[in-house]
Amino acid sequence: MPYPPLVPETEVKRRLLETLAASRERERELENLCDDAPSPAPERWTAKDHLAHLAHWRRYAADVLAAVHAGNPTPGADDVDGVNAEVQAANQERSAAEVKKAAQASYAELAAAIEDCSEDELLRPRQGRDGAVWEVVPPNGHLHLGEHLGFWHDAQGDEGAAEEAQLWTRDVHEAAFTDPKSLAFGAYNLGCYYARSGRAADAIPHIRRSFELHPDLKDWARTDKDLDGIRDEPEAHAILA
């Protein structure tokens, strides 16, 4: 889903680097699964596909930060589905070793781009987008990794591991960004995961908490497709009214 704007904080650089380090460590889970075996089904991504995809969007975030630091126009990302298809196609013939190496390099590239930016640069309004410059990092860092770990484990039929990945994402996010709006976003994101899985009883407490922390999220939630699977539940209907 598109991500609602987060909120600027102090020591943004440190916080971003902490989430990136946590993500880099956790991504070893996918690296260990990455090999050159083809997918058993055309629509199912391999671990190699996931790694290549995640690396591409980290490089995109690094390019945005580098452009801001240099005073240049920032790259756009309007046709996300088209870009994703191109990335997947381009990586079909690459070896697992190549993809792993590129994924590791993308972490170093993004970390360097964060380090190069000043706090003022990170807190500037993002060109052509809502929110601040630094907000390009979480959706292309730990939040993105957690999402794809969930996709991977769901495809393997391991609901417990998929859920654990979402809890990890929430914990990393809340440890780094402790203001009410960011805490609300962490709760909302977890609630959306449960809602997409049709688990209304698990989703609703997190959605409710997100509204308590950041009431404006309710306007977003009213049209968020991630919640469509639970809207007819009486309790969900009540909190979304």
Segments (PLM) and residue ranges:
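Short, contiguous alpha-helical
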Residues: P2-V7, D35-G82, L123-T169
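Acidic/histidine-rich alpha-helical segments that form the ligand environment
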Residues: V83-L122, E135-V136
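Start-of-helix register in tetratricopeptide repeats
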Residues: F185, D219-W220
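"A position-specific structural signal for the A-helix of alpha-solenoid helical repeats
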Residues: N189, T223-D226
